[in-house]
C-alpha cells in the first residue's frame, strides 16, 4: 500500500521529507523493522520510540510516524498522538478486520477475564470458530498464545484480528482495559456488544481519580453505536446493580440490556444454591427462564455468568443454548483455582488484586470453610499505593489469619509496600503476620492449615513470574503450593 493512500485514513497530519513509498509492514519495535516498514515512534513510561527512529531507518523503514521532527532521510509523518495514529492506520492497513467479526468487548474493574472466557466457551459450544483476547492469553481457534497486556497495543490487536479473519474465526470476545481505552488502542474496533462488569478502586496510579477511571471505561460505550448498520444491531450490556451503569447508559446510542441480582433487570439469577460441583440457579430473561448448573462458585461468578448470558442473548443465541453450554464452562486458570494434592484442607489460588475482588473471594471462601480461613496477600509495586491499606483491611476483616507478603514489587522497596499495608490494620495487629518472601508466606499458610481450613493465595492468579526490580523470575503460586503440600506430607 502506498504511504499517501494509507494516510488518507488519518486526520490531521503533516509530512516532513516528501515521498510516497510502498508500505509493506507496520512496526512499533525498531528491532522488527525490515525494508518497507512504517515505524511508529511511541512514548512509553521509561522508553521513547523517537530515540530509535535512526535505527529503524537503518533497518529499512520506508517512513516514520512521530510526534516531533526527526533528522532522518525518509518521510516523517508528524501527528499529535502516535498511539492514536497507529490505531487508525493499523485498522486501515489490515483491511478493517473487525467489520468481518462479531466482536464483544468487556470492560470493568473485576470479572473481565472470566466473563470473556464464558462468552467464548458458549459461542464455541454452538459450533462457531472463536477468538479470545485477554489477560491470560490470546486464542485463535484452537491455538493460544501468551498475552503481554490485558488489551494489546493497537498494531498487535489489528494484526491479530486480521489473522483471525484469515483463519475463519467469526466470533471474538475480548477484554478492554481502561488503559487501552484512554490511549486509543481500540480506536477503529467495531464492537457489536459492549459489556460493563463493575467499577471499584484500581489503576489510580494511572488515572488519578475514580472519575477519570470511570470516564475511561465509558469510552467503550461512547463509541458503541456510532456506525449504524441495521444488519448488525449493537447492544450495551450493563450491570444494573452497579450505580455507574446509570452514567454509561447516557453515554451510548445503543440499546441497553441490563443484568443483576438486586435491581430488577433484563437478565437475573434466582434460587441460587451451592452444589457439590459448583452452583445452580434459575436464569431469568425476557425470553423465559432456564435452570443453570455451573462448575463456577461465588456470587461474583454469578455476575460474570449473567453478564456473559446477556451478551450472548444480545448476540442472537437462544436461552436454551446458553443454559446448556454453561454446564460445561471451565474455570479460567488462576481464577478461584483449586490446588488439590489430596490434602484435608482446601487451597485456592485467585487473581484478586483489588479491595472489592479480594472481599468477594474471601466471602466465598468463608462459605466453603468448615474451620479457619487463611489468606496470603500482597500489593503490586509501581501501582496505586492508596489501595494497599484497604487490601490489608479486607484481609484481616474476612480471614482468620492474614499473611502479608510481596506481590510484584517492581522498582519499589517490598518492605515499604508491606509497611503501607500494615498502616491500615494497626488496631488488629493480632490477625496478621508479615512474611516478605512470597514462597515462605505460602509455605507458612499451608503449614498452619488443618482439616477443614481454606487457604486463599491471592493477587497473582495465573501468573508464572514475579517482578522484583528489573528481574522477572519464575514463580507460580500454584506450583509453590503443590510443593508445600508434598513437603508437609
UniProtKB/Swiss-Prot annotation:
<dbReference type="GO" id="GO:0005524">
    <property type="term" value="F:ATP binding"/>
</dbReference>
<keyword id="KW-0961">Cell wall biogenesis/degradation</keyword>
<dbReference type="InterPro" id="IPR000713">
    <property type="entry name" value="Mur_ligase_N"/>
</dbReference>
<feature type="binding site">
    <location>
        <position position="383"/>
    </location>
    <ligand>
        <name>meso-2,6-diaminopimelate</name>
    </ligand>
</feature>
<keyword id="KW-0573">Peptidoglycan synthesis</keyword>
<feature type="binding site">
    <location>
        <position position="183"/>
    </location>
    <ligand>
        <name>UDP-N-acetyl-alpha-D-muramoyl-L-alanyl-D-glutamate</name>
    </ligand>
</feature>
<comment type="function">
    <text>Catalyzes the addition of meso-diaminopimelic acid to the nucleotide precursor UDP-N-acetylmuramoyl-L-alanyl-D-glutamate (UMAG) in the biosynthesis of bacterial cell-wall peptidoglycan.</text>
</comment>
<keyword id="KW-0133">Cell shape</keyword>
<dbReference type="GO" id="GO:0008360">
    <property type="term" value="P:regulation of cell shape"/>
</dbReference>
<comment type="pathway">
    <text>Cell wall biogenesis; peptidoglycan biosynthesis.</text>
</comment>
<dbReference type="Pfam" id="PF01225">
    <property type="entry name" value="Mur_ligase"/>
</dbReference>
<dbReference type="Pfam" id="PF08245">
    <property type="entry name" value="Mur_ligase_M"/>
</dbReference>
<feature type="binding site">
    <location>
        <begin position="150"/>
        <end position="151"/>
    </location>
    <ligand>
        <name>UDP-N-acetyl-alpha-D-muramoyl-L-alanyl-D-glutamate</name>
    </ligand>
</feature>
<feature type="binding site">
    <location>
        <position position="463"/>
    </location>
    <ligand>
        <name>meso-2,6-diaminopimelate</name>
    </ligand>
</feature>
<dbReference type="GO" id="GO:0005737">
    <property type="term" value="C:cytoplasm"/>
</dbReference>
<dbReference type="InterPro" id="IPR013221">
    <property type="entry name" value="Mur_ligase_cen"/>
</dbReference>
<dbReference type="InterPro" id="IPR005761">
    <property type="entry name" value="UDP-N-AcMur-Glu-dNH2Pim_ligase"/>
</dbReference>
<dbReference type="GO" id="GO:0009252">
    <property type="term" value="P:peptidoglycan biosynthetic process"/>
</dbReference>
<feature type="binding site">
    <location>
        <position position="149"/>
    </location>
    <ligand>
        <name>UDP-N-acetyl-alpha-D-muramoyl-L-alanyl-D-glutamate</name>
    </ligand>
</feature>
<feature type="binding site">
    <location>
        <position position="459"/>
    </location>
    <ligand>
        <name>meso-2,6-diaminopimelate</name>
    </ligand>
</feature>
<feature type="binding site">
    <location>
        <begin position="407"/>
        <end position="410"/>
    </location>
    <ligand>
        <name>meso-2,6-diaminopimelate</name>
    </ligand>
</feature>
<feature type="binding site">
    <location>
        <position position="30"/>
    </location>
    <ligand>
        <name>UDP-N-acetyl-alpha-D-muramoyl-L-alanyl-D-glutamate</name>
    </ligand>
</feature>
<feature type="binding site">
    <location>
        <position position="185"/>
    </location>
    <ligand>
        <name>UDP-N-acetyl-alpha-D-muramoyl-L-alanyl-D-glutamate</name>
    </ligand>
</feature>
<keyword id="KW-0547">Nucleotide-binding</keyword>
<dbReference type="GO" id="GO:0000287">
    <property type="term" value="F:magnesium ion binding"/>
</dbReference>
<keyword id="KW-0131">Cell cycle</keyword>
<dbReference type="InterPro" id="IPR004101">
    <property type="entry name" value="Mur_ligase_C"/>
</dbReference>
<dbReference type="InterPro" id="IPR035911">
    <property type="entry name" value="MurE/MurF_N"/>
</dbReference>
<dbReference type="GO" id="GO:0008765">
    <property type="term" value="F:UDP-N-acetylmuramoylalanyl-D-glutamate-2,6-diaminopimelate ligase activity"/>
</dbReference>
<feature type="short sequence motif" description="Meso-diaminopimelate recognition motif">
    <location>
        <begin position="407"/>
        <end position="410"/>
    </location>
</feature>
<dbReference type="Pfam" id="PF02875">
    <property type="entry name" value="Mur_ligase_C"/>
</dbReference>
<keyword id="KW-0963">Cytoplasm</keyword>
<dbReference type="InterPro" id="IPR036565">
    <property type="entry name" value="Mur-like_cat_sf"/>
</dbReference>
<comment type="similarity">
    <text>Belongs to the MurCDEF family. MurE subfamily.</text>
</comment>
<keyword id="KW-0436">Ligase</keyword>
<dbReference type="GO" id="GO:0071555">
    <property type="term" value="P:cell wall organization"/>
</dbReference>
<feature type="binding site">
    <location>
        <begin position="108"/>
        <end position="114"/>
    </location>
    <ligand>
        <name>ATP</name>
    </ligand>
</feature>
<keyword id="KW-0460">Magnesium</keyword>
<protein>
    <recommendedName>
        <fullName>UDP-N-acetylmuramoyl-L-alanyl-D-glutamate--2,6-diaminopimelate ligase</fullName>
        <ecNumber>6.3.2.13</ecNumber>
    </recommendedName>
</protein>
<dbReference type="GO" id="GO:0051301">
    <property type="term" value="P:cell division"/>
</dbReference>
<feature type="binding site">
    <location>
        <position position="177"/>
    </location>
    <ligand>
        <name>UDP-N-acetyl-alpha-D-muramoyl-L-alanyl-D-glutamate</name>
    </ligand>
</feature>
<feature type="modified residue" description="N6-carboxylysine">
    <location>
        <position position="217"/>
    </location>
</feature>
Amino acid at each position: 500500500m502506498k504511504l499517501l493512500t494509507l494516510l488518507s485514513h488519518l486526520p490531521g497530519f503533516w509530512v516532513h521529507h516528501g515521498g510516497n513509498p510502498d508500505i509493506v509492514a507496520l512496526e512499533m519495535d525498531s528491532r522488527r523493522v525490515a525494508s518497507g516498514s512504517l515505524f511508529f515512534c511511541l512514548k512509553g513510561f521509561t522508553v521513547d520510540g523517537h530515540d530509535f527512529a535512526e535505527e529503524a531507518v537503518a533497518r529499512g523503514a520506508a517512513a516514520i510516524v512521530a510526534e516531533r521532527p526527526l533528522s532522518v532521510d525518509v518521510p516523517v509523518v508528524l501527528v499529535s498522538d502516535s498511539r492514536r495514529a497507529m490505531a487508525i492506520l493499523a485498522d486501515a492497513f489490515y483491511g478493517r478486520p473487525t467489520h468481518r467479526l462479531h466482536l464483544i468487548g468487556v470492560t470493568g474493574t473485576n470479572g473481565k477475564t472470566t466473563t470473556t472466557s464464558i462468552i467464548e466457551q458458549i459461542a464455541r459450544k454452538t459450533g462457531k470458530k472463536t477468538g479470545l483476547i485477554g489477560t491470560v492469553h490470546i486464542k485463535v481457534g484452537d491455538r493460544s498464545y501468551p498475552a503481554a497486556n490485558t488489551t494489546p497495543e493497537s498494531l498487535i490487536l489489528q494484526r491479530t484480528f486480521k489473522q483471525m479473519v484469515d483463519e475463519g474465526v467469526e466470533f471474538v470476545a475480548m477484554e478492554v482495559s481502561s488503559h487501552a481505552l484512554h490511549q486509543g488502542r481500540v480506536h477503529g474496533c467495531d464492537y457489536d456488544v459492549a459489556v460493563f462488569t463493575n467499577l471499584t478502586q484500581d489503576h489510580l496510579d494511572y488515572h488519578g481519580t475514580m472519575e477519570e477511571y470511570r470516564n475511561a471505561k465509558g469510552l467503550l460505550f461512547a463509541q458503541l453505536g456510532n456506525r449504524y448498520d441495521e444488519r448488525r444491531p449493537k447492544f450495551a450490556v450493563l450491570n444494573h446493580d452497579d450505580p455507574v451503569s446509570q452514567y454509561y447508559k447516557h453515554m451510548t446510542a445503543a440499546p441497553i440490556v441490563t443484568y443483576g441480582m438486586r435491581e430488577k433487570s433484563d437478565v437475573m439469577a434466582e434460587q441460587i444454591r451451592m452444589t457439590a460441583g459448583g452452583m445452580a440457579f434459575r436464569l431469568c430473561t425476557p425470553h423465559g427462564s432456564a435452570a443453570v448448573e455451573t462448575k463456577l462458585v461465588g456470587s461474583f461468578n454469578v455476575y460474570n455468568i449473567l453478564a456473559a448470558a446477556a451478551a450472548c442473548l444480545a448476540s442472537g443465541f437462544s436461552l436454551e443454548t446458553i443454559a446448556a453450554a454453561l454446564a460445561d464452562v471451565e474455570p479460567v486458570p488462576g481464577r478461584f483455582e483449586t490446588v488439590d494434592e489430596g490434602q484435608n484442607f482446601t487451597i485456592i489460588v485467585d487473581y484478586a488484586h483489588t479491595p472489592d475482588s479480594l472481599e468477594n473471594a474471601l466471602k466465598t471462601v468463608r462459605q466453603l470453610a468448615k474451620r479457619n480461613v487463611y489468606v496470603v496477600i500482597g500489593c503490586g509495586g509501581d501501582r496505586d499505593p492508596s489501595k494497599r491499606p484497604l487490601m490489608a483491611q479486607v484481609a484481616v476483616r474476612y480471614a482468620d489469619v492474614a499473611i502479608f507478603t510481596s506481590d510484584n514489587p517492581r522498582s519499589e522497596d517490598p518492605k515499604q509496600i508491606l509497611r503501607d499495608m500494615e498502616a491500615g490494620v494497626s488496631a488488629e495487629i493480632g490477625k496478621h503476620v508479615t512474611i516478605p518472601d512470597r514462597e515462605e508466606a505460602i509455605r507458612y499458610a499451608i503449614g498452619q492449615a488443618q482439616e477443614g481450613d481454606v487457604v486463599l493465595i491471592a493477587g497473582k492468579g495465573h501468573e508464572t513470574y514475579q517482578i522484583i526490580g528489573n528481574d522477572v523470575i519464575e514463580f507460580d503460586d500454584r506450583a509453590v503450593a503443590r510443593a508445600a503440600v508434598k513437603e508437609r506430607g
